[in-house]
């Protein structure tokens, strides 16, 4: 595909956001045989550790994540695949759309939080605010800093999309690329607020006042209606 093809019909932004969406659960074939990361990042890691999944035929001599003999190769998979394939696409999408494509920018922000909150819940401190910052040498943020950043990202996304809906009623430039919500910007706002509620519940013990504030903020938005697919 040429640069000219990419610039037509929002392809440059839409294709990138499609990769990010599939990168949430790593069910995207990145080429070179990279169509199996979901097994490592989810099945052999969180699913086994939590007891959600068990292997009928013992692997690794019957000693691995199922009995808390944690396997470095399995446990590092989410980190490696996120920072090698998904976060670079997020970073490029933010930079490419920030000033020119507000709707795509807002959706990128929401997807960024959706992708990375799973990563910080796996590992704790993660590289977030200093990603691609060579001077900071990819300094990791604490989990508290990351969660605070998540809430700010969602603030930005909801504000940008809300304004865009008012200024461009009925717009759906992203529809043909959107495998989650069919390019419906109202649904993306609902998703952002339901995601805010989920994150608020995650910090309810560690930071109850912050959790209460964020949960109430989500509920206060007129776009949030829970019995929808968002």
What are these regions (language model features)?
Residues 1-53, 81:
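Membrane-proximal, proline-rich intrinsically disordered regions
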Residues 55-224, 230:
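Structured, solvent-exposed acidic/aromatic patches
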């Amino acid at each position: 595909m040429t640069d000219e093809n990419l610039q037509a019909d929002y392809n440059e932004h839409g294709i990138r956001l499609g990769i990010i969406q599939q990168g949430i659960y790593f069910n995207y074939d990145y080429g070179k045989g990279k169509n199996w990361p979901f097994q490592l990042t989810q099945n052999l890691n969180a699913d086994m550790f939590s007891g959600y999944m068990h292997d009928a035929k013992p692997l690794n001599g019957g000693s691995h994540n199922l009995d808390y003999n944690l396997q470095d190769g399995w446990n590092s998979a989410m980190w490696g695949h996120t920072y090698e394939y998904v976060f670079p696409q997020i970073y490029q999408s933010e930079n490419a759309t920030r000033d020119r494509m507000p709707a795509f920018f807002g959706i990128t922000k929401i997807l960024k939080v959706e992708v990375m909150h799973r990563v910080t819940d796996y590992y704790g401190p993660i590289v977030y605010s200093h990603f691609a910052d060579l001077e900071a040498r990819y300094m990791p943020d604490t989990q508290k800093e990351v969660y605070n950043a998540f809430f700010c990202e969602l603030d930005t996304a909801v504000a940008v999309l809300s304004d865009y809906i008012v200024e461009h009623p009925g717009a759906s430039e992203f529809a043909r690329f959107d495998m989650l919500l069919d390019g419906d910007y109202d649904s993306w706002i609902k998703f952002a607020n339901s995601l805010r509620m989920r994150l608020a519940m995650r910090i309810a013990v560690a930071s109850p006042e912050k959790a209460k504030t964020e949960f109430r903020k989500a509920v206060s938005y007129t776009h949030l209606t829970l019995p929808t697919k968002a």
